[in-house]
Regions:
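Basic, polyanion-binding surface patches
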Residues: 2-177
Length: 177
């Protein structure tokens, strides 16, 4: 058996754009839509490629996988809920990112309140109800532009951040070695 000096599973020619995106990092959000009287199947996705644009009204912009079920449900309903996740929500973030199993489905892993905009995480202190304005293909993602029509900014707590493929607390600013 030989011991290698390089990482055996690491792509030696990692995509530099992907590496840049990983180093930018960002707050972790959970987008949900569908269910209840809306008529569409419920869907959700963990999203960290997000920004908020000020204005009247404010808008939320996010990059999502064009093939994910959330994208389809957002297009069908035109509405969604954007939750700002906290450190204690990291397992939920993994479930909605498709990285952790959820026997019974993603929405069995937490308590939800069904709204006209989609399922709202009962424990979320900060969330926005949004109406989708547009989808635009951008690289391998779709840019979702959504108008904020309802907003609750609650207790800050310890936010969940994502950097270089890992969830971090803001105090872990140096990130992984």
């Amino acid at each position: 058996m030989t011991i290698h000096t390089e990482h055996p599973f690491l792509d030696p020619d990692a995509d530099p754009v992907r590496r840049l995106r990983g180093r930018l990092g960002g707050a972790v959000t959970l987008w949900t839509s569908g269910g209840g009287d809306i008529g569409a199947e419920r869907a959700g996705l963990t999203v960290s490629s997000v920004m908020v644009s000020g204005g009247e009204p404010g808008r939320v912009l996010a990059l999502v996988d064009p093939d994910c079920s959330l994208r389809d449900v957002l297009e069908e309903t035109g509405r969604g809920v954007v939750h700002l996740l906290r450190w204690h929500d990291r397992e939920l973030a993994e479930v909605f990112a498709g990285q952790m199993p959820a026997p019974g489905g993603q929405f069995t892993t937490a308590e939800w309140e069904q709204t006209a905009f989609g399922p709202r995480l009962a424990s979320a202190t900060t969330w926005a109800e949004v109406e989708v304005e547009s989808f635009e293909p951008v690289g391998w993602s779709d840019l979702v532009v959504a108008r904020i029509v309802g907003l609750e900014v609650g207790e800050d707590g310890v936010p969940l951040e994502h950097r270089r493929g890992r969830y971090l607390r803001p105090s872990d600013a140096e990130g992984p070695a």
